[in-house]
């Protein structure tokens, strides 16, 4: 959704990020919502307990593994940001992924997923869910339109990312939603790289949205969290799964998440603007063989990004170095400001080597499908001054061709 586009309630995403989900009347007139650290909640009478047990007090709190007021507030905020009926936050993005998938699948079911998926997701599909006889089949982005003929009688879900980690391949959301509906399968997107500031997949017809809230939602690299957004009926199933496996979010982390969300719109825009400047600089650098960034006019997904990502290319830039691991090592070791670390979406610029991070342990075939090689480097661009980021990257690149 455009950053100034209004929600059904008439509020723009930047306003929802600040005020969404919050109760206007707080105890003692507090401007900031309190943090409810309590692990359990009492009842005034035995009759209240009985009514809660019978499901007659849906807004009551009982035990924080099931629900907590601080957690509920951030869930309402994220649901409104995505334009969904309901949301559930979890202890990590991986927990959100597992619960989103397991909530609808049973033994014998099949999940079709894009082969350009985050490494952790691939391992959940192939190493964890497979233990419950839930199988995964991987297809290319180009094959999504053929979902109705690709699916089997066992296919229950379709999972994909857009933009995809790490080289920013985009999926046409309208096409994917139509293909999933025609195939009669439930569609879930990992929209972590985009955030609802850039795109709202539910408005295109995608059934559910997952985010690693550790990233842009938190925005300060100081928490781990995940979230799933969709219809009330579906989210009830995901919430039930999360509470049963203990994947719910701690209220202290929920408070940090809510605080981070308040600056989401401005942080995402700043990151996108810096990313475009960095990507343009990298295209002119002789030590860079290729730049992957859909905000560049010569990128194959540029027009799609203009259409469905509010005209931005996102906050992640990937490159292929003119070289391999030895050149990558010299580059990483020469950086002075940019930090070598996994993750993304924080205020600081990070650089990672997918071969040894998000896609470690992948087979050569899997790496080719994901577009990852020994030359691939991913930048998660922060909100520092763009010239400082570029200067640091360029001085480090200048040393990749040097030998001792």
Task: Name every feature range the model reports, one short phrase each.
Residues 2-3, 126-127, 135-137, 156, ...:
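PLP-dependent enzyme catalytic core of the Aspartate aminotransferase-like
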Residues 4-10, 17-23, 86-287, 292:
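Conserved PLP-enzyme active-site core in the AAT-like
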Residues 40, 45-95, 120-127:
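Conserved N-terminal alpha-helix of the aminotransferase class I/II PLP-enzyme fold
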Residues 81, 282-286, 335:
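Acidic-histidine catalytic/liganding microenvironments
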């Amino acid at each position: 959704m455009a950053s100034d586009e209004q929600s059904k309630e008439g509020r723009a995403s930047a306003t929802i990020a600040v005020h969404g989900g919050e109760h206007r009347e707080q105890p003692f007139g507090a401007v900031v919502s309190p943090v409810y650290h309590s692990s359990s909640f009492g009842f005034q009478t035995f009759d209240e307990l009985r009514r809660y047990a019978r499901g007659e007090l849906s807004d009551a709190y009982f035990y924080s593994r099931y629900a907590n007021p601080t957690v509920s507030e951030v869930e309402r905020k994220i649901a409104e940001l995505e334009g969904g009926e309901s949301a559930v936050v979890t202890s990590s993005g991986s927990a959100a992924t597992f619960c989103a998938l397991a909530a609808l699948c049973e033994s014998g079911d099949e999940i079709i997923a894009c082969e350009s998926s985050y490494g952790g997701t691939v391992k959940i599909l192939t190493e964890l869910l497979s233990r419950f006889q839930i199988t995964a089949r991987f297809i290319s982005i180009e094959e999504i339109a053929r979902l109705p003929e690709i699916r089997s009688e066992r296919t229950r879900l379709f999972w994909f990312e857009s933009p995809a980690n790490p080289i920013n391949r985009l999926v046409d959301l309208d096409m994917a939603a139509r293909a999933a509906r025609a195939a009669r399968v439930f569609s879930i997107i990992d929209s972590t790289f985009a955030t609802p500031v850039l795109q709202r997949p539910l408005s295109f017809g995608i059934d559910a949205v997952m985010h690693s809230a550790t990233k842009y939602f938190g925005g300060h690299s100081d928490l781990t969290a995940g979230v799933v957004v969709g219809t009330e009926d579906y989210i009830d199933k995901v919430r039930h799964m999360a509470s049963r496996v203990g994947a719910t979010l701690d209220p202290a982390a929920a408070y940090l998440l809510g605080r981070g969300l308040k600056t989401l719109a401005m942080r995402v825009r700043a990151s996108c603007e810096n990313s475009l400047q960095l990507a343009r600089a990298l295209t002119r650098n002789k030590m860079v063989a290729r730049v992957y960034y859909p905000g560049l006019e010569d990128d194959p997904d540029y027009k799609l990004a203009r259409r469905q990502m509010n005209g931005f290319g996102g906050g992640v830039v990937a490159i292929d170095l003119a070289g391999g691991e030895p050149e990558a090592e010299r580059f990483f070791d020469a950086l002075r400001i940019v930090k070598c670390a996994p993750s993304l979406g924080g205020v600081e610029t990070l650089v990672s080597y997918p071969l040894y991070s998000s896609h470690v342990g992948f087979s050569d075939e899997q790496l080719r499908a994901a577009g990852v090689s020994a030359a691939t480097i991913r930048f998660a661009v922060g909100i520092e001054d763009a010239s400082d980021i570029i200067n640091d990257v360029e001085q480090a690149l200048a040393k990749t061709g040097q030998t001792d």
